């Protein structure tokens, strides 16, 4: 039985706004909160690069397959550094950035949280892209709450 109300919706939208501030993307900050039927927080997420990827720096070294069974740490030449730097800029960053909704779903999976029948709150309009919408459906999330077009 869901105990959703406008009061709780506003609280969870505000929490999604707070989590969006953790994103290092200066132009698009999105936060997501997944909540169970008793208003318990199951997971949170924000848009950003995958776990463990340093968004602030271009690495000078990286793992590369140079033969054999395991990757080897090798230096990156100037051309490769430039290619990696482009990943942090538009439009390339979109290929590497994980959306807040999917990050929240992945974070729930990491700790074994069941999302069946849960509600996803996010601070971004329009609501999920097609890829995120598929993930939301597959995760069993039954409701998405977000701001209307006039939300600040």
Task: List each language-model region with its residue ranges.
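Zinc-dependent deaminase catalytic domain
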Residues: 1-152
């Amino acid at each position: 039985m869901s105990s959703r109300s406008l009061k709780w919706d506003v609280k969870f939208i505000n929490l999604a706004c707070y989590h969006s501030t953790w994103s290092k993307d200066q132009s698009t900050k999105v936060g997501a909160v997944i909540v169970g039927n008793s208003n318990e927080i199951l997971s949170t997420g924000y848009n950003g690069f995958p776990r463990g990827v340093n968004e602030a720096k271009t690495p000078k070294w990286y793992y590369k397959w140079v033969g054999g069974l395991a990757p080897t740490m090798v230096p990156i030449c100037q051309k490769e550094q430039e290619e990696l730097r482009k990943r942090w800029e538009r439009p390339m960053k979109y290929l590497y950035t994980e959306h807040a909704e999917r990050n929240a779903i992945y974070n729930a999976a990491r700790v074994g949280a069941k999302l069946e029948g849960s509600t996803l709150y996010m601070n971004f309009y329009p609501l999920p892209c097609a890829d995120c919408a598929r993930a939301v459906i597959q995760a069993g999330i039954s409701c998405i709450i977000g701001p209307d077009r006039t939300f600040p």
